Structure formats: C-alpha cells, structure tokens
C-alpha cells in the first residue's frame, strides 16, 4: 500500500492535470491492519474526504476464514481514528455468508458497526473467488457455504437493522 504522502502526491498530480470539482468525493479504501491514526490525518490534510474500511465481521472465527489479519477491535479503532482525524465520511464494509457465520455472529457485527462514528455501512454477500484458499477449502469440503435461506435472512436482518439506525440502502 502506498504511504499517505505518495497518495496525496498522486491526488495533487491529478488535480494539476484534470479539473476536479471542489466538492468531489475523494475516497481511499484500506484494511484496518494497514493503518495507524496519523495515516488518516495525512490523507485528510491532503484532500481525501472519504475512507472505506474493510471491517468484514466482528467474529474472530469469521475473520480467520476470510484470511483477514485484523482483529475486530482494530477495525473499530480504525473507524474511530478516521473520524477523529476529521475525515468527512467514514464507511465500514461488512461481509455476510462466510462459512461458519451464525445469525448471532451477523447481528453482533451489525451491532458493532452501529456503535462507531461512521456515516455509511456496506453489507456484501460473500463471493468466493477461484484461486483463493477459501475456494480450495470449500471445494475440498472443509467448509460449507451457507444456503440461500441463510443469506436471505442475513440480508433482511441487515436491511432492517441499518434502516432503523438511519443507514439507507442504495444498491
């Protein structure tokens, strides 16, 4: 991952060569394990207005299946750091439908992100990409993918939970 100074340099180069609206949303996506508090301050000072963090889940066993290196707490800390740095928009991405994720795991993940200073939450159904360790484990029968009813339940839970807290579905 490029350090903030290089990202800001790229943004400056783009602005020098192309018209960029003053109110343009400039987004950086990041994984929680790859950022520190000063990272967000540097990006905000350089003109980035939105940070999207790949939180995925508050369940350690789900993060392990997804081969994620951050702890649930680290993901929540990263959202707080971005907000404290004054980043205008902070978003967390969740993934549902991971093998071994229960409905209670999913509800706890939603509860966790609802208590953070974010203004957007994305909830995506897991897509297992060929060539990944997860795809191999599923193909070998080591992990079972959830059925369509489980996925539908998790979608509905997220939709109702997030809407009740002012997050609006737009996709």
Enumerate the language-model features and the residues they cover.
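C-terminal scaffold of the Radical SAM
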Residues: 1-171
